[in-house]
Structure formats: C-alpha cells, structure tokens
C-alpha cells in the first residue's frame, strides 16, 4: 500500500473573497437587542455589533495569513477525506513525534 501524496500549499484567499466579506459586513442589519445585556434571551446585540465592527474595520486577514503561512502546510487525501496538516520537524538529539488534532471539520488556527 502506498502512502498518500503530501501536497504543499499556502493559505491565500482571493481578494474578491475578502471584498465580498467587507461588503457583507458593511450591509449587516441588526435586530433590536431588547436590553439583553445579560445574554439571558439569546445573543447580545451590542457584542455582535462590536464584533462585526472589529471584522469590518480592524481585523487584518493578510497579517493572519502571513502568520499561518510561517508554517509548512500540506494537504493529503486519506480514503476520500481531505486532511490539512502542518509538518514541523523536531529539534534536538532525540525529538519526539507529536500529533495535535482538532475535532471540528474544516477548522484550523
């Protein structure tokens, strides 16, 4: 049985994707909050507004992309399941292999 091919890649969202996100954030319409400061009746509208504002004005995707791309990213297909991994060689005379994984599909970082 052969090993699956490791395909190197860099994270690079198209600018059109980021432009689309900026447009959607700018067009966000918020429902009335109904004084839900304690989150007792669901999501807090003030928090959602602040979060949306942060994503629209302050979050720098390209800086995050550069930070993520400081690592060596690879993809592979394992029995039809796409896998994203980072391979970082250990240092020192006897490095120990370590596998870190997450349980939510398609998430990273």
Describe these PLM feature segments.
Residues 1-8, 28-34:
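Short, contiguous pre-domain boundary segments
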Residues 11-15:
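A short beta-loop-alpha structural element at the N-terminal edge
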Residues 91-109:
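Conserved HGGG/HGGXW glycine-rich cap/lid loop of the alpha/beta-hydrolase fold
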